[in-house]
Amino acid sequence: SGLQFAVLDGQGFLPFSRV
C-alpha cells in the first residue's frame, strides 16, 4: 500500500499511507 487516505487494501483498511 502507499496511499494518503483510508482505502481498502489487500490486507484490509489502512488508516493512512505506510509505504
From Swiss-Prot:
Describe its function.
Answer: Mediates visceral muscle contractile activity (myotropic activity).
Cysteine disulfide links: none
Predominant location of this chain? secreted
Residues carrying Valine amide: V19
Q: Name one GO cellular component term.
A: extracellular region
User: Where does this protein reside within or beyond the cell?
Assistant: Secreted
Q: Which family does it belong to?
A: Belongs to the periviscerokinin family.
Please provide the record's keywords in A-Z order.
Amidation, Neuropeptide, Secreted
Protein name stated in the entry: CAPA-Periviscerokinin-2
Q: Which domain of life is it from?
A: Eukaryota
Report the record's Gene Ontology biological process terms: neuropeptide signaling pathway
Key word Hydrolase present? no
